[in-house]
Each structure stands twice: as structure tokens, then as C-alpha cells.
Design a protein with these regions (language model features):
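Short, small-residue-biased leader/transition segments that mark boundaries at the very start
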Residues: 1-3
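Loop-to-transmembrane helix entry
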Residues: 9-26, 103
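Helix-to-loop junctions at the C-terminal end of transmembrane segments
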Residues: 30-43, 127-128
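Structural signature of the two symmetry-related core transmembrane helices
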Residues: 45-60, 137-140
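Short hydrophobic/alpha-helical segments at membrane-entry points of transmembrane helices
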Residues: 68-74
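Intracellular juxtamembrane helix-capping segments at the cytosolic ends
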Residues: 83-96
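Loop-to-transmembrane helix entry/capping segments in MFS-fold secondary transporters
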Residues: 98-108
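A membrane-interface helix-boundary motif in multi-pass transporters
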Residues: 125-142
């Protein structure tokens, strides 16, 4: 049983698969419909907007009193998460000389993979010690931290 299912079971809810479906559909739709916003508004601005939406979604998942709220939270989280990786990737690659862009993109991808490798056990420990609901609170805090770092990087880039 995955964390999504255990979260639903811990709340006494049914239909956990719908939550993942809503997340996935919103993620894909946002990528398809708004990918051009990165070139239009810039990577930092797009990432800041998306992380803000993602954070709201995670907080809704944390506080959800019913499956309806959880579905809305999952949708917002999927929508928000969709453009963070490509938007920040655009900004990361801007910092690398043209001759090294392939290596720069590889390094960016490695750090994303490293973050995923750390997040799994970390969130597992949160679930084990605090309960499944607190995974979403912890993820929201990390999203706020990422938002703060992105704002800082945007200010530095504009200076």
C-alpha cells in the first residue's frame, strides 16, 4: 500500500486512486497549457507562481476535512509542481557557458534525482513518527523554503 492509500485509510476515506488521478491530470494539463509561460515570464517568475500554488495544495492536503478538499489539494499540488523543474532548469542553464550546457543540464538533473532519493526516506520517517497527514505539512514547509530560495535567486539575478 502506497503513502497515498495509507493517508486515505488513516483518515477513514475511500477512493485514494482518484487523488492520484487528479494530481496527474492537473500536472499534465498545466505542462501542456502553460509551458510557454516560462519563456514569456521567465523561469524564476514561473517557478515562484507554481511553488505558491503547490504550497497551497499541500496545505489543503494537510488540513483536508474531506476527500473533496483532498482532491482540490492534489489538483493544485500537481498543477503547481508541473512547471517548477523546467522553469528552474531554464534559469540554471542560463548560468552555464554555451559550451557546457549539456554538462550543466546533467548536473541539474542529478541534483533533482538526489532530492528525490532524500525525500523518500525523509517523508517515510515523518509518516512513521508523526502520521501520514504530516507528510503534506512537511512538504509544504519544504515548498516554502524552495520558494524563499527562488525569490532570493531571482533578486540576485536582477541585481
Amino acid at each position: 500500500m502506497c503513502i497515498r492509500d495509507r493517508y486515505y485509510v488513516s483518515r477513514g476515506w475511500a477512493g485514494a486512486a482518484y487523488c492520484l488521478t487528479v494530481f496527474g491530470v492537473c500536472f499534465i494539463l498545466a505542462r501542456l497549457l502553460f509551458i510557454s509561460s516560462i519563456s514569456r515570464f521567465g523561469g524564476f517568475t514561473s517557478a515562484i507562481a507554481c511553488m505558491s500554488i503547490e504550497t497551497v495544495g499541500l496545505v489543503l492536503l494537510w488540513l483536508a476535512p474531506s476527500t473533496g478538499y483532498a482532491l482540490i489539494g492534489a489538483g493544485l499540488t500537481g498543477f503547481g509542481l508541473s512547471l517548477v523543474y523546467p522553469a528552474l532548469g531554464v534559469e540554471a542553464i542560463k548560468q552555464v557557458p554555451n559550451s557546457s550546457r549539456g554538462a550543466g543540464l546533467s548536473a541539474y538533473a542529478v541534483f533533482f534525482d538526489l532530492a528525490l532519493a532524500i525525500a523518500g526516506p525523509l517523508m517515510g520517517a515523518v509518516a512513521l513518527n508523526l502520521g501520514y497527514t504530516w507528510i503534506f505539512f512537511s512538504a509544504a514547509l519544504l515548498s516554502v523554503a524552495g520558494l524563499g530560495l527562488t525569490l532570493l535567486l531571482k533578486r540576485r539575478a536582477m541585481a
